[in-house]
């Protein structure tokens, strides 16, 4: 009887550890995709911040106008 209880306890502990590992992996993967989206936004801004001339500034302003998230053009003038 005692062996059965020990076996059941060990089984429950293993199940709990595996369940938490799967949950932690899902959380890491969700954080990773959010981080990737932020990185893409930063890369887009770097393209706009580094204009080589008026043509690129105009393209930057045009891209900014077409984006619903863009509220001002101050990063285009740098």
Curated annotation (Swiss-Prot):
Alphabetical UniProt keywords:
Disulfide bond, Secreted, Signal, Toxin
- Summarize the PTM comment: Contains 2 disulfide bonds.
Q: Which domain of life is it from?
A: Eukaryota
Q: Which GO terms describe its molecular function?
A: toxin activity
Q: In which tissues is it expressed?
A: Expressed by the venom gland.
| Residues that make up the propeptide removed upon maturation | 25-28
Q: Where in the cell is it found?
A: Secreted
Its cellular-component GO annotations read: extracellular region
Which coarse location class applies to the principal site listed for this UniProt protein? secreted
Q: Which residues form the signal peptide?
A: 1-24
Does the keyword Transport belong to this entry? no
Family named by the database record: Belongs to the scoloptoxin-04 family.
Q: What is this protein called?
A: U-scoloptoxin(04)-Er1b
Origin organism of this chain? Answer: Ethmostigmus rubripes (Giant centipede)
